[in-house]
From Swiss-Prot:
Binds 1 zinc ion. It is an enzyme of class 3 (hydrolase). GO terms for cellular component: cytoplasm. This is Endoribonuclease YbeY. Its main location: cytoplasm. Belongs to the endoribonuclease YbeY family. GO terms for molecular function: metalloendopeptidase activity; RNA endonuclease activity; zinc ion binding. Keywords: Cytoplasm, Endonuclease, Hydrolase, Metal-binding, Nuclease, Ribosome biogenesis, rRNA processing, Zinc. Single strand-specific metallo-endoribonuclease involved in late-stage 70S ribosome quality control and in maturation of the 3' terminus of the 16S rRNA. It is found in: Cytoplasm. It comes from Streptococcus sanguinis (strain SK36).
Length: 165
């Protein structure tokens, strides 16, 4: 999995950048998304507030904003076309590779780690996995969706070794 990471805050350590890369690759493997691409931008509460207002019409900062990328291709392609034109198949695969972008508030992660009584590393891992699942179609609007998403999220974090303690 290719992950572009940008730290707009200048506060994210190399260890956290490495952990974020690793846990997202781990989550991608667990969900069958290894051949995908995404971006992660670490932001301040101020920037998170701006983004939350712009994308969600919510006037406050938030911990993670997930922007799922859903490309629309306005052409019909059948299997014969793909067999006759392997370059078309490759182009379509590349077209579908980018899955989205996460904006993680470093300030909120610190606040929440303290509030929930676990490490900053755990909170950053949690936010990365939570956002990753959102850009891959998981949600928590209904009790059933919540059980599925939160169950998978906890399974990934625990298997990776980021527990609440």
């Amino acid at each position: 999995m290719y992950i572009e990471m940008v730290d707009e805050t200048g506060q994210v350590s190399e260890e956290i950048l490495k952990q974020t890369q690793e846990i997202l690759e781990f989550a991608a493997q667990k969900t069958g998304k290894e051949n995908k691409e995404m971006a992660v931008t670490f932001v301040s509460n101020e920037r998170s507030h701006e983004l939350n207002l712009e994308y969600r019409d919510t006037d406050r900062p938030t911990d993670v904003i997930s922007l799922e990328y859903k490309p629309e291709l306005d052409i019909a392609v059948d299997e014969e076309d793909l067999l006759d034109h392997p370059e078309l198949a490759e182009m379509l695969e590349d077209f579908d590779a980018y899955i989205g972008e996460l904006f993680i508030s470093v300030d909120k992660a610190r606040e929440q780690a303290e509030e929930y009584g676990h490490s900053f590393e755990r909170e950053m891992g949690f936010l990365a996995v939570h956002g990753f699942l959102h850009i891959n179609g998981y949600d928590h609007y209904t009790p059933e969706e919540e059980a599925e998403m939160f169950g998978l999220q906890e399974e990934i974090l625990t298997a990776y070794g980021l527990t609440r303690k």
